[in-house]
Amino acid sequence: MTKANGAEQLADWKFQYDLLTNELFHLHEFTSLLEFDPAFRHESDSFARFLADKHLELRMEEDAGAPGLEESSAMRRIRRRQKRGRGEEEGNALLKGVEELVEQKYADLRARLDRPMLKQGPRKRKQPGDAAKTALPHDSKKRKSAVVRKETNDEEHLKEEKSASPTVWSPESPQRDTYRTIHPSGDHEGYQSSSSDSFYFTTSSEDEEPTVKRSLKRKKAPVRRIKLIVHPPKQTVTNPLHILKPECSSLHEFLQSYKSLDEDISIEEFDSYIASQRKVVSAIRKGLKSGVLTYDRHTDSIQGISLKDVQNSQANKPEPITTFYQEQEKHTLRDHLNNHGVVMSRMFQDRKRGRIARARKISQMIEQHFKHVAGAEERKTKEEEKRRRALARAAVQAVKKRWNLAERAYKVLKKDEEDQLKRIQGKEHLSKMLEQSTQLLGAQLNQNDDSDDETSSQVLSENESSLGDEEMSSSSELDDSEVEAGEDDSKLTVEQLRAKYSALEHITIDGRSQNSEVSSMTENPEEDPQEYKILLSEREKAELHRTFETEENNILDEDHSSSSSFSESEISQTSSSENESLINSNSSQTPGLASLFGNVAEELSDDAHYSTEESLSSTPNEDQEGVQPNADAVSNMEIDSLEMQDKDESTNLEKLSVVDVPVPPLLRGTLRTYQKQGLNWLASLYNNNTNGILADEMGLGKTIQTIALLAYLACEKENWGPHLIIVPTSVLLNWEMEFKRFAPGFKVLSYYGSPQQRKEKRRGWNKLDAFHVCITSYQLVVHDQHSFKRKKWQYMILDEAHNIKNFKSTRWQALLNFNTRRRLLLTGTPLQNNIAELWSLLYFLMPQTALENGKISGFADLDAFQQWFGKPVDKIIAANDSEHDDETRRTVSKLHQVLRPYLLRRLKADVEKQMPAKYEHILYCRLSKRQRFLYDDFMSRAQTKATLASGNFMSIINCLMQLRKVCNHPDLFEVRPILTSFCMDRSVMSNYAHLNQLVLKNLNKHALDTVVNLQCTNLAFTQNDFNMETHYADSCARLQCVRQFSEAVEKLRKDASLPDAKDDPNVLNYQDMHEFYTGYTVRKRLRLIDQYRHTFYLNSLRCEKRPVYGINLVRLVSVHHRPPLECNVMSELMKPLETRLVTHKRIIDEFAIITPTAITLDTRVLSLGLDSEAAVHPVIKSDINTQLSRMKNPFHLLQTKLSIAFPDKSLLQYDCGKLQSLAVLLRRLKEEGHRALIFTQMTKVLDILEQFLNYHGYLYMRLDGATKIEDRQILTERFNTDPRITVFILSSRSGGLGINLTGADTVIFYDSDWNPAMDKQCQDRCHRIGQTRDVHIYRFVSEHTIESNILKKANQKRQLDNIVIQKGEFTTDYFSRLSVKDLLGSDETEEIADERPLLEDPATTADSKKLERLLAQAEDEDDVKAARLAMKEVDVDDRDFRESSTCANPSPDEDVDEEPVEDEYEGTRHVEEYMIRFIANGYLYD
């Protein structure tokens, strides 16, 4: 074969290969050959990737061996080595020609496709050149048959084995022109003959050129062979005698061809399974990546997301589809035929089933039709029967409905009759209750008909008035004798206390009625309470009725001429201040229920004052004594009309008073007048077997009155308990301290702690006289109610009893069932306008009441109570006019009469003359120089002006808080710094120390060359006469070792080890180690010899020194005179350093105040010459360092004062104008014997006050929010009892529950709190019951600052509700009326034109709690924590009374005048009447 023929054939094969690969690529991409263009050559990147992925790329092999022949690797290497470098140019030219031929074939194919009808002859191809025209020899290459090799590779895909593998051409090696086809399966078979199987190509083109016969001659050039590896078709059985060749040659190979999963599968199936699993895994990964799937950590699984989740996850969008069609599985024609047959078979079967189903349906319809025709008569009969049953059912239901209606009508009529009967019985019950209340009130009051009694009462009042203010003011202070007696009582046993106070019952007091009925009824106090009966004769009842009627008429006549009706606004107000004040009223007034309680208490209190008032009317010094009751209270009394049965009878008004009881000796301290009256009232309750409510205003001493009652029972009635007192948690310890203070003779058990501690306290408490009083909280008494119910209590006292007004709560039910003899409720809150709450308290007091006939009757139920009093009282509250009907007023009068015996309430306004006065002072303080500088600097900042102009509430509050800090103390705004010097490790001198040494060294380099030491050369011989003796010189000359030394040197020089001949001993040979060591030794010994020679020379000169005369001769001829006079002038001038420091210590302390700006640490070392660069001998340096380490530094104090400067302690006071004023005020208070409380809002101010008080040496105590409740009680008790403590500094946020600081008479507000309620609580801690001196309140205000502006505006706008303190809260009116200009002044806010208020948010204005939270954001963290702790203490009490169930409150706005209800049964016929009579006779239920 010639070279041209070979190139042409190669080009033909390359062209066929390209056609096949294009066709495969088109099928892969589009799954159809409909639009396939065989003339188009793909050169895109996707086509190259397709060839690479399918392993169809065409590359050149370097195998030069003949196909079908096996050659050894050695022979191949030899041929390669021989042919190296040859044929490279020929191969490149051949490849170039092949490409041109392939391109020409594509051009011919495009031309044929464009002109399919034209016939073209054989074209003569264009030769590329001379080299292409040169023919190869015919015998250069021998024709060989093509060998088809099959390679086996288990790792390739099975789908690619079905299609014939095309030929791949790869021009990798230009040296070899052998081509092969790479099949992905990689299967190899043995060699086969060319006649058995031949390779084939499948192409869509039918135009093929005839095969050119090649010459069989062998050429000398290296043979380029084509190695084709094709995939042969599978063996098919075409004859029964045909025997298939087994695929596996052995059994082992056959077994290895299967894989075992759940069952045995073939390799192909296994590969298919693996491929499918890979696709599933890739799909899952793609789903996770695109966001369609998600991984659930909890279930450890992959979950699909919903459509909503897919819409929300916009970040993970699926990738766009890159192909239009998926690759379909390629089936053969036989497979398509089989599938078509299966589909047609199924279609025929479905049609058959459909025809059968339609036939069955038609037959069923025919059958149903004939059945319907046959059953028409029977069906008609059944429908008629069904219709009749429906009519009968409707008739029965109508009759039954009518009977039900008649039954309801009968029940309504019967209920009306029962209600009528109940109203009659209720009126009878109410009459009995009113009669019983009259009896109780009459038993409490004692008629003073006898003139002797009147005289004794006058004497008693004069004795009481003669006690004076001094005796009245000693309620909170104990005399020494009383304290000693209290201590003795606390040490006595119960039997000794009984013996000590047993004789007190025989003591009689002047003015006490010995023959009264009440006294005779209480002679035997140990009888059962049920045995006490309230009995009055008919004459006494009538007389008492006439007395009340006459009293009412007289007072109403007086009030009619002096009082005026209230306005509508005054009637509708229900604030605590009006409920607690005395209200004038007449017959046309509109009294509310809240005012009824105050009026009842006032009437009772006024009745108690009648006898005293008459006895004191002739006393000239009534006002000085302070015992006369308030004249305004008497003039403003209200007594509603009490209509009795006997209206015709009337008598003169008699003076009535509560029976006076003696003050028990067991009580330590003196009761005030109103407290003594309260004790009398409580004692009358006990004597009349009645419970009551002590409702005095907060701060009037309900605790001391209760303790006095228990002491009275112990001393007078010999009733030592046990008593149960239930109080809020926060005041439990306060009650215990009050018992120890006023009644130390009682054994008090404070029941609190953990369950184990409470169990330990209950151990043995059933023994006689184990304790007298048990104090516990509401929460614990309900928790341990089973233990408390088993014990019998003499008195159960509830503090803050208004919190048990909910009768549906479990606490109310539990306390109601306690085994108690008497009950007392203490409350300082006015009772609300709620009939249900009022009934709850009254029923709790009187669940059972004794009657005249010895029977026990319970209190009225809630329904009856609301029926009697509910609607009239609601009508009064909701009324807009001043006139009411007589029935309403009579009902209110009855309510007065019911409540009058059980309630006592006094206000501070009634007893204000018996309390010390309160004075308020405002001290304006000037700002210090530093404060003024910081204040003006902060206000002049651009940021501050922008913040104030912004109008943001929180930003403005933050600015105001900073200004308040400057006013309180500048250290709160900016701490005065501690001055220290800037410390440097090295000074400037150390940088030039080395240079200085170098310069000195260079300057003195030749100094020794020109200067001759005459002393060393013995030329200065005259100096030897002053320090040398002749004997010493002779001895040195005689003892010198000159000869021995010179011999040793010569011997060393002539040592045999030293080489005598040496060229230059200073030059060392570093190339040879031996020579180097020898030369180095010679140099060392020569240097040593020179040193010894010089030493010998100097020693000779020293030994040859001789004096001319000698010092011994000079001493011999010298004459000594008398010693000179001693003088200490020089010793005074040369004092030691330590002495000078001690002498000038005062100067150092006072004037060593200027701290240098910068200091260095190496100055001392440089000055002493101890640095490393100093020219001092190391031995001398070491000696100096040793001496300095042993020496105490005399300059330590001076160095310390100059290195650090602390602010002077006096600057703490002089930096603040308030502290300067406080220093003057405290000095004056200390001299006058006063004790002060200093309150501040900020916790950091307490730290500054501590430093201030320590600086001045005042003894003080501190209480802030971090102080525990137990420690707080101890601190307050110590302050009240220790007069040495002058000052008590407190935080206004430290909580005010149970704090009583009556030991102080001065209150100083260092700064004002945002919440005015806090300031009022702070005042009440000092100005309360128990205070014996006038209270002065000082408020510090910085002038010309925000504080003075706030105070000025507050005073201008302060009216009734401008700053309202209600229920511990404060209104936002304070901030809603003030603007920035009002707070900072017009001078500071000239640039702010808007005068909007600080707080404009309506939500914040309506919610005070929200305002408190906003203000807390501007305060310090410590202050916020303190406020939270205070609120937490309040929440503890709130949790004691918090219940989930609430009592239904009747609406006061409910319309009383209801529309008349239409009578449903009006005009009933005779049938309905018959039905009702039938039901009434009871026949319906038989």
Curated annotation (Swiss-Prot):
Pfam families from the UniProt entry: Helicase_C (PF00271), HSA (PF07529), SNF2-rel_dom (PF00176)
Signal peptide (residue range): none
Entry GO CC: cytosol; Swr1 complex
Domain (Helicase C-terminal): residue spans on this chain: 1221-1371
Extent of motif DEAH box: 799-802
Bias (Basic and acidic residues): 148-163, 174-190
Comp. bias (Acidic residues): 467-487, 1452-1465
Low complexity bias (residue ranges): 193-204, 562-588
Catalytic activity: ATP + H2O = ADP + phosphate + H(+)
Major subcellular location class: nucleus
Positions of region (Disordered): 63-89, 113-219, 446-492, 508-530, 548-590, 606-628, 1436-1468
GO terms of molecular function: ATP binding; ATP hydrolysis activity; DNA binding; helicase activity; histone binding; structural molecule activity
Polar residues bias (residue ranges): 164-173, 511-523
Residues that bind ATP: 696-703
Superkingdom of the source species: Eukaryota
Localization per Swiss-Prot or TrEMBL: Nucleus
Annotated ranges, domain HSA: 321-393
Entry keywords, A to Z: Activator, ATP-binding, Chromatin regulator, DNA-binding, Helicase, Hydrolase, Nucleotide-binding, Nucleus, Transcription, Transcription regulation
Enzyme Commission number(s) of this protein: 3.6.4.12
An annotated GO BP: chromatin remodeling
Entry similarity comment: Belongs to the SNF2/RAD54 helicase family. SWR1 subfamily.
Subunit structure: Component of the SWR1 chromatin-remodeling complex.
Protein name: Helicase SWR1
